[in-house]
Design a protein with these regions (language model features):
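Phosphate-ester processing/binding pockets and catalytic centers
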Residues: 1-221
Length: 221
């Protein structure tokens, strides 16, 4: 199948301390809350502590893509309810953890965070990774590859500086279209984000499906 690769990391990089983390967000960093910006911003990380589980989950997502007739990639906000149900059912057997931060933008008063989207993104990514419950130990981090090249360099330097040694082995920005596990992070962030919108039908449905995987969701206020 084209579009998603199964190989997660070169075999030579795999050891007993394997930690793979996939990060994506739901919502936007904008503050035009009365004219289109989302009221909540959610950032989630999916944590695999076993290489084989990561490979099997990736394969299952690819197979679900065929079974559910998804022609491009899994994106929570572009999927119908049937596809969302099928996706979360497909990944349920595999061992991974979920940690997330939910930002209620109405509680953010910092001028810098409200007016500089890249600073907003970097700040909450750092908070998510810093409050990791001990999950990040020499972790291989993959982030959905949005942003320009300079921002990616600056973000990588910022995280290494702020987090200190030991948490992050390497950080890569990847194309979600080519990485099934980044699509998993998108679907997870989307499910948690949807649960915040209590006026929406089935707002908590997919977060409930994820409940056995969730290690922590931090409501930042």
């Amino acid at each position: 199948m084209q579009g998603c690769v199964v190989r997660i990391l070169p075999q030579a990089t795999i050891g007993d301390g394997f930690v793979l983390v996939l990060i994506d967000e739901s919502g936007d960093p904008g503050f035009k809350l009365t004219s289109g910006s989302t009221p909540y911003f959610v950032m989630a990380m999916v944590i695999f502590r076993d290489y084989r589980q990561a490979e099997l989950a990736s394969q299952a997502i690819q197979e679900a893509r065929t079974a559910l007739r998804v022609t491009s990639e899994f994106k929570f906000n572009k999927c119908c309810d049937v596809v969302r149900d099928g996706f979360f059912e497909a990944v349920q057997p595999f061992k991974f953890g979920v940690r997330a931060i939910i930002v209620d933008k109405s509680s953010i008063y910092s001028h810098n965070l409200r007016t500089e989207p890249e600073r907003f993104y970097s700040f909450f990514l750092r908070l998510l990774m810093d409050h990791d419950g001990g999950a990040l130990v020499n972790a291989r981090i993959k982030i959905d590859g949005s942003g320009d090249r300079q921002f990616k360099r600056e973000l990588t330097s910022y995280l290494r500086r702020q987090l200190g040694p030991g948490k992050m082995d390497n950080l890569r920005f990847v194309d979600s279209h080519k990485d099934a596990l980044i699509q998993l992070a998108d679907m997870v962030a989307g499910a948690i984000g949807r649960s915040c919108n209590t006026d929406r039908k089935n707002h908590a449905r997919w977060r409930k499906q994820l409940a056995p995987k969730i290690e922590n969701v931090w409501p930042f206020r």
